[in-house]
């Protein structure tokens, strides 16, 4: 059996989760590194998954209006399409003659609202479609994700390797397409990119945002869709990991129920501030600011591993 987690450790790890979840530096890698370097034990994949519920709750609150609008547009448009498909057919010669509407302020507002509704409907589908790959792979490789994928040699390597991917995306990405031009192909590519985040050190936001940049999306559009895309996957992962987190077994730090709750609340509060800051940051700055940090951190961890200061497992 592992050691019991202290309240200080729970607070620190909740803070780390909130600070790093939305930055392209991998929150799972930071929880793995901080718990091992400073506390001598791995907090575990289940602890990571459950505290991510706090940061995803922050996304739900921050994007509440967007999410509600997408849900309403998706359900109502789907219902309208279903009714139109099953309704009575009107012969062409019996259909009323349509006239081009007179362009007025009211019409412009209505057209804009319809365009927004169509976009929200499409984004709803894109999130659903893009979530399928990580759902399948996460289920098939759940044991490997909780064990071998948390090896610090692999984590440090992925921190460095994906730093280069992010830098390449910033350099070669056209960054011309707004979120209104998002397509099914974009959603699928970003969905498969999200699967890479199953490996600590990659970063969910880093993987999906980089994919969006390679596809030519504007940086802010790529990051915004990245946040929306993470909601179903991270929420499902956290709920799936709840039983293991509350009944820990084996090596590592074991958190109690109250400690998990406090860590999750801390991650929510800090995560909300983090997502608000990042969206403002990417509107004016590139993701290259995080590249150097990832490389330095990866090299430091490799150095500590090579010197025998910390254990890889």
UniProtKB/Swiss-Prot annotation:
Its EC number is 3.6.1.27. GO terms for biological process: cell wall organization; peptidoglycan biosynthetic process; regulation of cell shape; response to antibiotic. GO terms for molecular function: undecaprenyl-diphosphatase activity. The chain crosses the membrane at residues 121-141, 152-172, 187-207, 225-245, 259-279, 290-310. It is an enzyme of class 3 (hydrolase). It catalyses: di-trans,octa-cis-undecaprenyl diphosphate + H2O = di-trans,octa-cis-undecaprenyl phosphate + phosphate + H(+). Keywords: Antibiotic resistance, Cell membrane, Cell shape, Cell wall biogenesis/degradation, Hydrolase, Membrane, Peptidoglycan synthesis, Transmembrane, Transmembrane helix. Catalyzes the dephosphorylation of undecaprenyl diphosphate (UPP). Confers resistance to bacitracin. This is Undecaprenyl-diphosphatase. The gene is uppP.
